Amino acid sequence: MARSTREAILTAAAELMRHKGYGAVGMKDIAAASGAPIGSLYHHFPGGKVQIARAALINAGAAYALLIPAVVDDHTDLGQALHAVFAQAAEDMAGTGFANMCPVASVAAEVADTIEQLREATAGVFTDWLDGGTAYFIQRGLPDATARDVTVALVGALEGAFVLARTLRSTEPLMAAGRVLSAPYRGVDLAPLRTSLPGAVGRSGQGATASR
């Protein structure tokens, strides 16, 4: 029972931060959204809102990391795979009324210079996405340096395009980023997927078609 209450709190906190960021979310908001009394929040998270946010962001980051591989797994052409990631992200954003923003990205810029615990947490999530994505693309047959470059460019382009898409209420930023990023990699083969990699983006990112 304690675990389900804890998970309900983290899920509610992540969902609230996805829509509102960190500063606009209060403990009463989390209690109301999770169905847990305020006392339960402090029982499970004596560190209060910062501790809840940190745990929620790490949990959400692990879930979002599974999204990119979920799209890429079935593709054998890197360019087509990258285009598919952005197309799926655009579909997800439009389908949620441009509200499907990753909580990690929503909070990261907001707290980077003000709350060190959360800066470290979001930095850790991004690092996991980049390292996991690099390992994933290496497993799919890309040279190490290319795998890293593709992952960094993919995550960076997605995060930036999500912000523009949400602000403009338009999928154009995602579709344009997908066209430009995928074009140089058309015809680049991806090796068949053999085994899953724990922590690989798309298996951690929130991310990333993590319509963040």
Task: Describe the predicted segments one by one.
Residues 68-100, 139, 150-154:
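Hydrophobic alpha-helical connector segments
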Residues 92-94, 155-173, 184-194:
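Amphipathic C-terminal alpha-helical segment
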Residues 103-106, 145-164, 176, 180-184:
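Hydrophobic alpha-helical segments that form the core
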Residues 8, 12-55:
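Helix-turn-helix
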Residues 53, 80-84, 95-117:
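Amphipathic alpha-helical segments used for helix-helix packing
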Residues 9-17, 89, 133, 158:
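Short hydrophobic clusters on alpha-helical segments that form packing/core surfaces
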Residues 114-116, 126-151, 187-195, 199, ...:
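Hydrophobic alpha-helical bundle segments that form small-molecule/ligand-binding pockets
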Residues 80, 120-121, 139-155, 172, ...:
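All-alpha amphipathic helical-bundle segments outside canonical DNA-binding/catalytic cores
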